[in-house]
């Protein structure tokens, strides 16, 4: 299964449980008229949002079963683990649910 398909399934599963999760775009985009638009920083997780029960910030990196974190993603992971947020690497909707509802921490 592709990362995009897993991500879509995760977002749907999380919405169905009442939490909110949004797709994140990192890096930069060059428009047709050659303007550069900076998005989120490199390494920012694939999805972010908030938990319905307390509004706690969620950041979830989505990977396939064999996917590995890039150096920029490892840097964000190291930072996230020092913050009072919900962060993890999810390879399935159940992983994401566990991160959000049970405080599970998944690494690569």
Each language-model region and where it sits:
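Catalytic phosphate/metal-binding cores of nucleic-acid and nucleotide-processing enzymes, i.e., regions
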Residues: 1-108
